[in-house]
Curated annotation (Swiss-Prot):
Gene Ontology, cellular component aspect: extracellular region
TM regions (residue ranges): none
Family: Belongs to the three-finger toxin family. Long-chain subfamily. Type II alpha-neurotoxin sub-subfamily.
Subcellular location: Secreted
InterPro entries hit by this protein: Snake_3FTx, Snake_toxin-like_sf, Snake_toxin_con_site, Toxin_cobra-type
Name of the protein in its database record: Long neurotoxin 73
Swiss-Prot/TrEMBL keywords: Acetylcholine receptor inhibiting toxin, Disulfide bond, Ion channel impairing toxin, Neurotoxin, Postsynaptic neurotoxin, Secreted, Signal, Toxin
Amino acid sequence: MKTLLLTLVVVTIVCLDLGDSLICYQAYNTPQTCAPGENLCYTKTWCDYWCHVKGKRIDLGCAATCPTAKPGEDVTCCSRDKCNPHPLQRPR
C-alpha cells in the first residue's frame, strides 16, 4: 500500500508543472504573468508617422518565440522575470 501511495505521489509531482510562470512587462510599469508556453519577454520598437514628435512606438509582452523584426523594427527578447522594462523605466 505504501508503494502504491508513493508511486501516486511521484506521478503527481512529475505531471504537475511546479515551475513558476514568467512575468513580463506588458506596458509601462505593468507586469503580467505570461500564459503557459510563453517563456520569453519581448520589447519591440519602431517609428511611425509621429516618431519625430512622440518618439518610437514601444510594444512589450510575452511570447513563445521571439517575434521576427520587420523592416524598421527593433526586437529584443529575454527569459528572466521583468527583464523587458519600458525604456523610460531603465536606470540611467
